[in-house]
Amino acid sequence: LEARGKGLSVAMSNVSNAKNIMDVAEGGFQNVMDILHTLKEKATQASDDSLSADQRTAIGNQITALIEEVDDIVAETKFNGSALIDGTYSKTFQTGEGVTDSLAVALNNSDSAALSINALDLSTHALATVAMGAIDSAITTLSTAIQEVGDIKSRLSSKETALSVAYTNTEAVRSTV
């Protein structure tokens, strides 16, 4: 019983760590989403056919800076040195005391190239409209990634509750023996 209790305790710690990782990933994804919303505003502004070439260029420069910020966020969203949202994060968390009690997680890439927003052109009304569509697609893609992280967090919370109950029950039995 003592070994089981210790195993459950370590599993709870693993689950807590996994939840922390998912929180960091979700925060990174959300920061990218905030920029996507700003990009959508800028592209909508640039699609106004009454803008001058200089105005479009200024908006284009802002867009370029925002896209660079997306890539910076992706590069900087890390946990214990591991990049989380650049498409390379694929780990298996030990979520229980048994050999098969694990959860495999692979997080999506949210850099500008993966979201197809790395080459937005706002130089004309028509191109700005195309950019709006690309940004809408990126928002949809990223929304799915955020939802997947939310689902993982929900599974981890359920597992954490089950482990806590099992640990409490194990300790109760152990104390009566």
For each feature predicted by the language model, list its residue ranges:
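Primary detection of the long, small/polar-rich alpha-helical "axial" segments characteristic
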Residues: 1-177
